[in-house]
């Protein structure tokens, strides 16, 4: 496994306290605000005209919730991320043609949101473990490009 037993413990320990629905909406919203070019995949989502509009957009929140619930399911299969994300990789890569760089950006935004929510608890060791996880997930999602 790309994570040690200790790292898995840190990731699962923090993740058990995450409000997945709320954090998902915030992470996707921040992605669209911070990296505005990612908005082109969400043109059907309505008003994305300002940071406030994006962060309060119900469709953004709903998709963010969906995204993070999938991420959460993936954590249960941490030793087979490629398998866990095969279908989503196919959808995003083959059908939607999402640039895989966007998966990496969202992973980094998620790390920021977790740091923001958990403060001191999100210490350097926890961050290091989560960076490995989001990199692993991004790589699994980009798998169809290789």
UniProtKB/Swiss-Prot annotation:
Annotated Gene Ontology cellular components are: blood microparticle; haptoglobin-hemoglobin complex; hemoglobin complex
Q: Where does heme b bind?
A: 63, 92
Residue(s) carrying N-acetylserine = 1
| Gene3D superfamilies in the record | Globins
Residues annotated as carrying Asymmetric dimethylarginine in the record are 104
Name the Gene Ontology molecular function terms of this record: haptoglobin binding; heme binding; hemoglobin alpha binding; metal ion binding; organic acid binding; oxygen binding; oxygen carrier activity; peroxidase activity
Please give the residue positions where the record annotates the modification N6-succinyllysine: 17, 59
Residues with the Phosphoserine modification: 44, 50
An example of a Pfam family matching this protein is Globin
Q: Give the transmembrane ranges.
A: none
Q: Where does the entry say this protein is expressed, by tissue?
A: Red blood cells.
Keywords per UniProt: Acetylation, Heme, Iron, Metal-binding, Methylation, Oxygen transport, Phosphoprotein, Transport
Q: Which residues form the Globin domain?
A: 2-146
- Whom does it interact with, and what assembly results? Heterotetramer of two alpha chains and two beta chains.
Q: What else is known?
A: In the cat family (felidae), the oxygen affinity of hemoglobin depends little or not at all on the association with diphosphoglycerate (DPG).
Family classification: Belongs to the globin family.
**What function does the entry list?**
Involved in oxygen transport from the lung to the various peripheral tissues.
The name this protein carries in UniProt is Hemoglobin subunit beta-1
Please name the source species: Panthera leo
């Amino acid at each position: 496994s790309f994570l040690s037993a200790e790292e898995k413990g840190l990731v699962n320990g923090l993740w058990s306290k995450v409000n997945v629905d709320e954090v998902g909406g915030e992470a996707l919203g921040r992605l669209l605000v911070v990296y505005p070019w990612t908005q082109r995949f969400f043109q059907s989502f309505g008003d994305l005209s300002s940071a406030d509009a994006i962060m309060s957009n119900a469709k953004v929140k709903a998709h963010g919730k969906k995204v993070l619930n999938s991420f959460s399911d993936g954590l249960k299969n941490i030793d087979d991320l490629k398998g866990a994300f095969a279908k989503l990789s196919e959808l995003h890569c083959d059908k939607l043609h999402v640039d895989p760089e966007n998966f990496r950006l969202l992973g980094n935004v998620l790390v920021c949101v977790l740091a923001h929510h958990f403060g001191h608890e999100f210490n350097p060791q926890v961050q290091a473990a989560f960076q490995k996880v989001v990199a692993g997930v991004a790589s699994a999602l980009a798998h169809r490009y290789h």
